[in-house]
Amino acid sequence: MIEQLIQQAQPYWQQYIEHEFVQQLAKGTLPKACFQHYLKQDYLYLFHYSRAFALGVFKAKNFAEMETPRKTLEILCQEIQLHLNYCREWGISEQEIFTTQESAACIAYTRYLLDCGMTGSLAELYAAVTPCALGYAQVARYITQHYPRLPNNPYQTWIDTYASEEFQQAAQETVDFLTALCKPLNPSQLAEIQQIFTTATRMEIAFWQMGLDLA
């Protein structure tokens, strides 16, 4: 299922995984200001991303379905402090983060996620959130497989976080849940799933570009 979604989302998926932002991260050449801008916007993104999983709990039809988005939401809420700590290491105070204005790319992407969650099924919501989870897992694998590990890469901690077995497993669980949700769907419903997945992938490209452009 996921292979088909990715294939049908080309060329956008490859542009997402191999974006210039990603390549500069891998080489350690990304300007510090670009990464700081990305980190601040990512915090704002994660707030709305968490809200999307809260909608997933609401959309669930039974306790079994509820468990996956509930677990993800709990992890996100626990780890947001780690994100704030990481931002502090990059010279970004909590006050600066809390007063940062959302970029146009962040608004477009997060409101699209929430719209899918508000108006669509649980499967449609997961079609919207899966490109983020799976994509970051694939980005980390792409970097580790195609670029040498540099001893002084300032972005190595970021790379290691998403290359970790824990994150890779969490991404796979998201994929597996989406696959299960899609099994009973008819061709028309699956076409909508594809459209959402592809659109969210395009939004991810725009988010990387926002970081590069300091937009």
UniProtKB/Swiss-Prot annotation:
Disulfide bonds: none annotated. Gene3D superfamilies: Heme oxygenase-like. GO terms for molecular function: thiaminase activity. GO terms for cellular component: cytosol. It comes from the Bacteria. Pfam families: TENA_THI-4 (PF03070). One of its GO terms (biological process) is thiamine metabolic process. SUPFAM superfamilies: Heme oxygenase-like (SSF48613). NCBIfam families: salvage_TenA. Belongs to the thiaminase-2 family. This is Uncharacterized protein HI_0358. It comes from Haemophilus influenzae (strain ATCC 51907 / DSM 11121 / KW20 / Rd).
